[in-house]
Structures are given as structure tokens and as C-alpha cells.
Design a protein with these regions (language model features):
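Active-site-adjacent substrate-binding region
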Residues: 20-34, 142, 146-235
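Domain-scale recognition of functional cores that engage charged ligands
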Residues: 17, 25, 30, 63-70, ...
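A short glycine/serine-rich beta->alpha loop
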Residues: 54-64, 95-101
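His/Asp/Glu-rich mid-to-C-terminal helical/loop segments that flank catalytic regions of hydrolases
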Residues: 78-91, 228-257
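Short, small-residue-biased leader/transition segments that mark boundaries at the very start
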Residues: 2-7
Length: 257
């Protein structure tokens, strides 16, 4: 043991770190270090989500971006009662790094999947018309207005936590929203009394973007970008209003029918 420690002490610092982790990984998997050819490592915050605030009206949690949207979409699809047409959700990988991977929104995965479904339904010859009549919801979180950075927002289009989900628009088309799709969502919200608000990116500052523009370029259908406003987006713990999650879930359920 003494000679092994002496040899290890003479290794370069980076090699020591790699050796230390490989030893840990090999022990966890009950294999030899030499059996490990490669690995991927992702770091997660393991603290539990919490309701916070005077009336527990806020949620503090890791990964609200974009688990909030995934949860609302899955619930809405399960609750859907409409039997005609196709209800489909796609939970893509790699949105935070550009979406241009084989399982990201920048791939032909969704386009090909819809084509195959239409073919199996005997609608291959009318696929273009079917797609033209379709609509895409791009659901991702939005930056809520921060009390310490209020000047970063357009004063007339600021998303406030607790006032419903956001319909997101941008003249740069970083959000894929078009007026026809907005009208559909607004009508649903007004009919079912679902709270919503509009958010427009400032044209003189770089703002966020979503996979909506990427996906709709490959699948040219009416599209609207929506999502829940957050504070501290991309931090280890993010903050949202619990009522906004209910509003988003209600909208998705009504949208799927």
C-alpha cells in the first residue's frame, strides 16, 4: 500500500482526480477500472422541492425549467377526451444546448413520426393538408420580472409571477408565436376563465428563445410559445407561483379537449 501511494503521489494532479473518480465508479458498479471505457456525468441538486411564502403560494425547486411544462403536457394528454385527430406531445432533449441533435427539436424526428402515423391511418396523400390544419404548442418557461432588475423588462409587457402562464412573442422570432395561434389560446382561456398574460421580448436586448422556432421551421404549422414565468431561471433552485402551474395545466387540458 505504501508503494502504491507513493506512485500515486507522483501522478499529475488531473490524472489523480480522474483516477479517484474511476475508482469510485468502479466500486459502485463492482467492476475493474479498466472495464470502464467511457462515462457521462451529470450533476443534480438533490434537495427536495418546497412550498414557500406566507401562504405557501410559491414553489422553490430544482429544474422547474422545464419540468413544469412536461408535467402539464403529460397531465393534459392523459385528461384529454377528444377522440378525433391526433393528440401528441414531444419531450425533446438538448433544448439548452441548441436542439440540433438526433433527439432534439432540430432533428426530423417529429416530422417523420407524424408522417408515419398519417401513413398508417391511410392519410399519406393528404398529409400536407392535415399538417396545415394542425397547431403546435411550444411550452417552455419565461423570465418573470425581478424586483431588483425591473428595468430589464418592457414595462407594458412584463410577466408577473402568480398572474397566469405567459403567451410569449418576439419580433426576432426567437419565439415562434403567430397571431392565429394566439387567437386560439386566448379563446380557450376566456371560455374556461384561465388566467394568462402576454410577454414580449425587448427588441433592444437579447432575450430568451425556445425550440418553438426550430421545430416549426421543420414542421410548418401554426405555433404559439407559452410557459410559466420563473425567477432565478437556470439556478440550482428556481422559483415560481403555484397558481401558474394550475393555469398551464388547465390550458393544456382544454387545448387537447
Amino acid at each position: 500500500v505504501g508503494s502504491e501511494m507513493c506512485i500515486r503521489d507522483r501522478l499529475p494532479e488531473e490524472e489523480k482526480k480522474a483516477d479517484y473518480f474511476l475508482t469510485f465508479l468502479a466500486d459502485e458498479l463492482s467492476v475493474e477500472k479498466t472495464d470502464i471505457l467511457d462515462f457521462e456525468l451529470t450533476v443534480y441538486c438533490k434537495e427536495n422541492p418546497e412550498f414557500i411564502g406566507l401562504n405557501d403560494d410559491f414553489i422553490s425547486s430544482p429544474r422547474l425549467d422545464n419540468l413544469t411544462s412536461c408535467a402539464a403536457l403529460i397531465s393534459g394528454l392523459i385528461d384529454a377526451g377528444r377522440m378525433e385527430g391526433i393528440n401528441l406531445i414531444a419531450l425533446f432533449d438538448h433544448e439548452e444546448i441548441g436542439s440540433h441533435t438526433k433527439q432534439g427539436a432540430g432533428s426530423i424526428l417529429l416530422h417523420d413520426m407524424l408522417r408515419r402515423i398519417l401513413k398508417e391511418l391511410g392519410r399519406e396523400q393528404t398529409a400536407e393538408q392535415d399538417l396545415y390544419r394542425s397547431m403546435l404548442l411550444s411550452v417552455d418557461v419565461a423570465h418573470g420580472i425581478h424586483p431588483n432588475q425591473a428595468g430589464k423588462m418592457d414595462l407594458t409587457n412584463k410577466p408577473v409571477l402568480g398572474r397566469g402562464f405567459c403567451i410569449k412573442e418576439a419580433s426576432s422570432q426567437s419565439y415562434a408565436t403567430d397571431c392565429g395561434a394566439v387567437a386560439v389560446i386566448q379563446q380557450i382561456c376566456e371560455k374556461d376563465q384561465i388566467p394568462y398574460q402576454k410577454f414580449v421580448n425587448r427588441s433592444d436586448l437579447a432575450g430568451g428563445g425556445t425550440l418553438g422556432s426550430i421545430a416549426s421551421a421543420l414542421l410548418p404549422v401554426k405555433t404559439v410559445d407559452i410557459g410559466i414565468p420563473l425567477l432565478a431561471m437556470h439556478s440550482a433552485r428556481e422559483l415560481m407561483a403555484a397558481a401558474d402551474q394550475q393555469a398551464l395545466k388547465d390550458l393544456v387540458s382544454a387545448y387537447f379537449g
